[in-house]
């Protein structure tokens, strides 16, 4: 997935969930939009180097968006979780998700379920059961362990219930954890943050719901991040 043209700055603070103040190389201070409403643990500390994009839209109050954080150890994290579906869509198109590579038709944002939900991707293939794929972003990393969620997610809990219902109807149901951080090689659910999500997903997996985690990799050109892609599945620690 190609990233938009990026510029760097230093993070001053994040506030009101959707806003962040940054210091430009010139010393000027600017307010930008933050699309991530999660806790962003470890990915948004004062003084961090961040990368932001610019939009030409005339309707936006804040034309710049926080895209990536560069951590002190040099690792990168895409904090704009709106990018995750585009990342997975390209991986599905390119048959990079080996567990789903047999499907040829990809339908994004399809209404389904009993709780007024939209599935991120509905996959179809000749002679195959329909496959419902819910995408979750991995931005929380400790050591080399990627985790989800970084905050209690009642929405995520709902999605697990919906996926289990699809599985009981004879379809495939998959949670795909996509690496937006390039610092992990293993994955587990952060049960200490959301024990209910952990419980629901474990119960759903016992009944046939599938879960996979894929690592992310950034491309760098002239010291500027230019692209992000999913590379390979990593061990899922239950």
From Swiss-Prot:
Gene3D superfamilies: 2.40.50.580, 3.40.1350.60. One of its GO terms (molecular function) is DNA binding. It holds the Pfam family SfsA. It comes from the Bacteria. HAMAP family: SfsA. Belongs to the SfsA family. This is Sugar fermentation stimulation protein homolog. The lineage of its organism: Bacteria, Pseudomonadati, Pseudomonadota, Gammaproteobacteria, Pasteurellales. The gene is sfsA.
